[in-house]
Amino acid sequence: MKLSKIIFIIAIFIFTANSVQAKKITPKRETVEWIDVWLPHTNDDKLPRVLLIGNSITRGYYPKVEKLLKGKAYVARLTTSKSLGDPALIQEINLIMSYGKFDLVHFNNGLHGWEYTEDEYDAAFPDMIKAIRKNAPNAKLIWATTTPIRTGKYCERLKERVARIVTRNE
């Protein structure tokens, strides 16, 4: 009797361990992963705070946004190669947003994570919104959709990705 109880307990433990492992998300990463963070005026609360979350495109237009909002808002950035679907993106958002209150959050995430399907991307989108809302419940949110590539010498070669971008933006 005791032996059968022990076997039963071991079987439940093994089943539970396998079940938990099956639900573990394996990130689909690029060959090189990167993160770039800029948090200016962290000890100053005279102006509203804006956070730009995105990739290298966001990092590219950050200086212009910062210049346009000079004297009106402090502009911070979290730019990363992480994509929706990668739990590390949510961790990065939580970390950066823990540094202070943000009044507006502008986010654009879509040109990385090609290994994630559109269904995986769609399923992960609410998690990003929840993370932003958890850290900045009263912030205004701006979602910048990913711009499809429609012209240029690479257009034909990128046709499949452009179709995926359009689907992700819907």
Annotate the PLM regions.
Residues M1-L52, T58-Y74, N94, S98-G100, ...:
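N-terminal secretory targeting modules
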Residues S56-I57, L69, T79, T145-T147:
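A mature extracytoplasmic/lumenal domain signature
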